Amino acid sequence: MADKENSTPASAARLTRSSAAAGAQAKRSAAAGVADGGAPPAKRKRVALSDLPTLSNAVVVAPRQPHHPVVIKPSSKQPEPAAEAAAPSGGGGGSPVSSASTSTASPSSGWDPQYASDIYTYLRSMEVEARRQSAADYIEAVQVDVTANMRAILVDWLVEVADEYKLVADTLYLAVSYLDRYLSAHPLRRNRLQLLGVGAMLIAAKYEEISPPHVEDFCYITDNTYTRQEVVKMESDILKLLEFEMGNPTIKTFLRRFTRSCQEDKKRSSLLLEFMGSYLAELSLLDYGCLRFLPSVVAASVVFVAKLNIDPYTNPWSKKMQKLTGYKVSELKDCILAIHDLQLRKKCSNLTAIRDKYKQHKFKCVSTLLPPVDIPASYLQDLTE
């Protein structure tokens, strides 16, 4: 027993020396590995939220025409969404895709296709709720100092702002939805219309973007016409009107589902349909008259006109599209004609931001494509059983 007790400290010492030697050998091996060009596995430090740097957007004022507000060019740009300037990614079963996976209106691309039909039904039920809609006649019924042309100029400018900041498409569509819903309930002076636009864009950016522009950035893009306090106050007023429910199905929500489900096998045709659909959908935002149509109706009509542009000799509508969208051509006819007129420049022809945007090669220059002057009457008739 005594021998065992006396041997314990010695054994412990030997173990300690052995461990130290092993540790030293491990360090030498690691150092040798680095010297030989092999890097040891890096340990990443978890950064606390309070330690994250605040991203600032240094801006340069770009001169604009007198009737346009000032547009900015940020030096630190956010990542450009792949779905807008590259091949579409994502969603099984033609599901809507969004940068914000928690958005009710824009489910993420990881959902199970077996739920696609249920989600679409849910989104359709959301869009018909009165509290989520804007009035189709608010210019005549509510506004005194704001006209449809002023609204179109504002939306055209917001398209430029979203493009300069590389904001996702959902941000633009939500912002336009917010401003229309606000104008449906509150009369506004024309000198406050741009303030409403930046307030709506600020809320939409916070909801959709990973790194949204700051309040100061939105003050700056208006050439400091409004103070920070005014922008924050407008943001608060809009949120109260929305009752802080910022998620809403938009034209883009439904357009994603429809285009994913009807794309052709050829990559070129698929991209043309994607970009032409996005172009026509943004044009529809300019037209005050399109407010009388539900977002899903506009999205379905956009797909019709886009397919007509790509292949004018084939009926754009089919039983598959009718089943997918739930709409007959007769239910879309008025909206189809409205979007066709927009593309033919019969309306909003003096507003060029969207057309200039889609003249770029990354969008396959879809705004330069000439649409058919007339839509064949047979295409606007319901399909026979």
Curated annotation (Swiss-Prot):
Cross-referenced SMART domains: CYCLIN, Cyclin_C
Keyword tags: Cell cycle, Cell division, Cyclin
Keyword Cell cycle: yes
GO cellular component, one term: cyclin-dependent protein kinase holoenzyme complex
A single GO BP: G1/S transition of mitotic cell cycle
Start and end residues of each stretch annotated as Disordered: 1-110
Superkingdom: Eukaryota
Signal peptide: none
InterPro entries from the UniProt entry: Cyclin, Cyclin-like_dom, Cyclin-like_sf, Cyclin_A/B-like, Cyclin_C-dom, Cyclin_N, Cyclins_cyclin-box
Keyword check for Cell cycle: yes
UniProt cross-references to PROSITE patterns, sorted A to Z: CYCLINS (PS00292)
Biased composition (Low complexity): 7-41, 74-88, 96-110
GO molecular function: cyclin-dependent protein serine/threonine kinase regulator activity
Family, as annotated: Belongs to the cyclin family. Cyclin AB subfamily.
Protein name: Cyclin-A3-2
Organism: Oryza sativa subsp. japonica (Rice)
Lineage: Eukaryota, Viridiplantae, Streptophyta, Embryophyta, Tracheophyta
